[in-house]
Amino acid sequence: MLSGELRAIRREKGSRGYIKELRKRGLLPAVVYGKDKPDMLISVNAKELSGLLKAMGSASAILDLQVEGSDDRHKVMLKEMQRDPVGRMPNHVDFQLVDWNKPVHAEIPIHLVGTPAGVKAGGIIQHGLRTVEVEGLPGKLPPRFDIDISHLELHDKMTVADITSPAGIAIISEPDQVILSIIVPRAVLEPAESAPVLEENGDKGANGKANSNGKANGNGKANGDGEKAEE
């Protein structure tokens, strides 16, 4: 399992105004718990955490937490990230201390490899799951699942049951959950609309021409008000 270093600052349990001030400074209030130890209140740099998780490609990565002003270093995993309900920005983080001898639950990202044969034939990928839930010892967790999809034809699909997990890792997600399907684009499925047929409102005259209210004159021509013209 990949790991990365994250700096943290100890904080006090403050008021709502104090927490709001932390966020204005780009810091996320966080808590570290686990291994029967007292909870530790900290704050971390929001951009640093986001960049680290993105670079490591998994929210289940093991982080080496370095507490500023001390020699304290802790191996932790991100357990929960709370987000603002409106802007969806992170506003609080829970970290769990890693016990190397105790299995943990983790979300492992799925990485698709190759271009499906069905896509080359004109199909498109319809995505399902992006991550798979697993259980295993922290040191054995894979950073991601690489899945070859180049063999998939039109109308084929791939489910969790098609994933092979490494030794010591159990997949918890339901096996019939769909990861992706190769489907025919909607534009191909729907027939093209035929051109509309224009309807003629009047009866045709002797030469095929109609007047404005449908009455024809003697030679097949109609005058403006539909009355028969003088011969």
From Swiss-Prot:
<dbReference type="GO" id="GO:0022625">
    <property type="term" value="C:cytosolic large ribosomal subunit"/>
</dbReference>
<dbReference type="Pfam" id="PF14693">
    <property type="entry name" value="Ribosomal_TL5_C"/>
</dbReference>
<comment type="function">
    <text>This is one of the proteins that binds to the 5S RNA in the ribosome where it forms part of the central protuberance.</text>
</comment>
<dbReference type="InterPro" id="IPR011035">
    <property type="entry name" value="Ribosomal_bL25/Gln-tRNA_synth"/>
</dbReference>
<keyword id="KW-0687">Ribonucleoprotein</keyword>
<comment type="similarity">
    <text>Belongs to the bacterial ribosomal protein bL25 family. CTC subfamily.</text>
</comment>
<protein>
    <recommendedName>
        <fullName>Large ribosomal subunit protein bL25</fullName>
    </recommendedName>
</protein>
<keyword id="KW-0699">rRNA-binding</keyword>
<dbReference type="InterPro" id="IPR020056">
    <property type="entry name" value="Rbsml_bL25/Gln-tRNA_synth_N"/>
</dbReference>
<dbReference type="InterPro" id="IPR020057">
    <property type="entry name" value="Ribosomal_bL25_b-dom"/>
</dbReference>
<dbReference type="InterPro" id="IPR001021">
    <property type="entry name" value="Ribosomal_bL25_long"/>
</dbReference>
<dbReference type="InterPro" id="IPR029751">
    <property type="entry name" value="Ribosomal_L25_dom"/>
</dbReference>
<dbReference type="Pfam" id="PF01386">
    <property type="entry name" value="Ribosomal_L25p"/>
</dbReference>
<feature type="region of interest" description="Disordered">
    <location>
        <begin position="195"/>
        <end position="231"/>
    </location>
</feature>
<keyword id="KW-0689">Ribosomal protein</keyword>
<dbReference type="InterPro" id="IPR037121">
    <property type="entry name" value="Ribosomal_bL25_C"/>
</dbReference>
<comment type="subunit">
    <text>Part of the 50S ribosomal subunit; part of the 5S rRNA/L5/L18/L25 subcomplex. Contacts the 5S rRNA. Binds to the 5S rRNA independently of L5 and L18.</text>
</comment>
<keyword id="KW-0694">RNA-binding</keyword>
<feature type="compositionally biased region" description="Low complexity">
    <location>
        <begin position="207"/>
        <end position="222"/>
    </location>
</feature>
<dbReference type="GO" id="GO:0006412">
    <property type="term" value="P:translation"/>
</dbReference>
<dbReference type="GO" id="GO:0008097">
    <property type="term" value="F:5S rRNA binding"/>
</dbReference>
<dbReference type="InterPro" id="IPR020930">
    <property type="entry name" value="Ribosomal_uL5_bac-type"/>
</dbReference>
<dbReference type="GO" id="GO:0003735">
    <property type="term" value="F:structural constituent of ribosome"/>
</dbReference>
